[in-house]
Amino acid sequence: MAQVINTNSLSLLTQNNLNKSQSSLSSAIERLSSGLRINSAKDDAAGQAIANRFTSNIKGLTQASRNANDGISIAQTTEGALNEINNNLQRVRELSVQATNGTNSDSDLKSIQDEIQQRLEEIDRVSNQTQFNGVKVLSQDNQMKIQVGANDGETITIDLQKIDVKSLGLDGFNVNGPKEATVGDLKSSFKNVTGYDTYAAGADKYRVDINSGAVVTDAVAPNKVYVNAANGQLTTDDAENNTAVDLFKTTKSTAGTAEAKAIAGAIKGGKEGDTFDYKGVTFTIDTKTGNDGNGKVSTTINGEKVTLTVADITGGAANVDAATLQSSKNVYTSVVNGQFTFDDKTKNESAKLSDLEANNAVKGESKITVNGAEYTANATGDKVTLAGKTMFIDKTASGVSTLINEDAAAAKKSTANPLASIDSALSKVDAVRSSLGAIQNRFDSAITNLGNTVTNLNSARSRIEDADYATEVSNMSKAQILQQAGTSVLAQANQVPQNVLSLLR
């Protein structure tokens, strides 16, 4: 090896080795101080790229876990509002059950409806004002997507539904609306109600006054109706003619010769107190008669005594005593019971509803006048109409009864089957709450899975980029020793050219 001064090869070699050990020491210290095996791409280019992708996934999944927790919060907020809506619906149902009880007065029903209305308004308020981070969760149908993954499309959808009075089918819910008017309602709710019911018995038609019960014919100029005293048939005659008894038919002395002769023959030889019958009439002999049949006989009709004198039979011109007959009443046979009476007519009684029914009369429609307006009621009296429209009884704000037609009543008509309507609303709320409960459980599961994934990805990334302290400490110790040795050797190498100077002495 040549002895040169210009180039110290040993020094250069030592410097190079010293630089390497310095670089190794620097790398070890950097890794130990940062905790990372890869502090820059030069440390491990491929590993750095892989670790960076892991970092993206880890950060994305961590945020996704927070998103899922937000989803739980949204579901809890919505479900809490629905719980309050459910409480209001339960109270409305309770009030509706109370309202259907027949013991409630009009004021009771009004109070019940007032509270129901307040409850329904509260349901709408909860629907309109419940929100999460500025998003209203019950005021409209909405699908809210929650990002629960680190990549596109990894979402869970929360179905938010509009829940208010209208969507629940309770818009216009009413337990105290106007009810269909009946004839009974008109009589009880209004003053000075007049009118009549119509009946038909065969071809004959009648009217019955709804207040007095008087029966008249159904005509422009109605006639009063009576019940025939003899046969119970309906008639417009107020009396029936009784049958005159021939024996007492006349008061003239020239008449009744045949009757006188017949009576004379019956009492001939009779004694006082004897009785005999003639034409269904029982007579008593008042004076003893001889063989000529002359004498007096009497009978009692309607409590009044009637006396007949038979005289001048032997002369062949037997006559009823004129004076006696003129002071007595004509006698008739009643068409009702066949008894003798002084009345030439039997009075018929005014017909009543029961008489119409006895004659198999069939009830028809009714005409009812209220406050000057005439309404028509059907045969059963449970439907009242005006101009073809069904009438309802409503209450004014001051509680006064009033009649309105079906058009006006439609907007505030009582809800048909109110309990079924509320049950349907409760079922819808329950369905939405169940969905929200299920989605909360799903988010819980997603959060657990995300946590597991993040843990595993962190472990995988750690194995790639984290520093192994045992290895790095060993590397640092090795580099430190090499640094110390290199520095010492470099000093020796730098002394080698000094040996060449000895040749110049």
Swiss-Prot record:
**GO CC annotation:** bacterial-type flagellum; extracellular region
The reply on keyword Secreted is: yes
Q: Which UniProt keywords apply?
A: Bacterial flagellum, Secreted
Compartments where found: Secreted; Bacterial flagellum
Q: Which InterPro entries match?
A: Flagellin, Flagellin_C, Flagellin_C_sub2, Flagellin_N
| Gene3D superfamilies referenced in this protein's UniProt entry, alphabetically | 6.10.280.190, f41 fragment of flagellin, C-terminal domain (2.30.220.10), f41 fragment of flagellin, middle domain (2.170.280.10), f41 fragment of flagellin, N-terminal domain (1.20.1330.10), Flagellar export chaperone, C-terminal domain (6.10.10.10)
Similarity comment: family membership = Belongs to the bacterial flagellin family.
Q: What else is known?
A: Individual Salmonella serotypes usually alternate between the production of 2 antigenic forms of flagella, termed phase 1 and phase 2, each specified by separate structural genes.
**UniProt-recorded name of the protein:** Flagellin
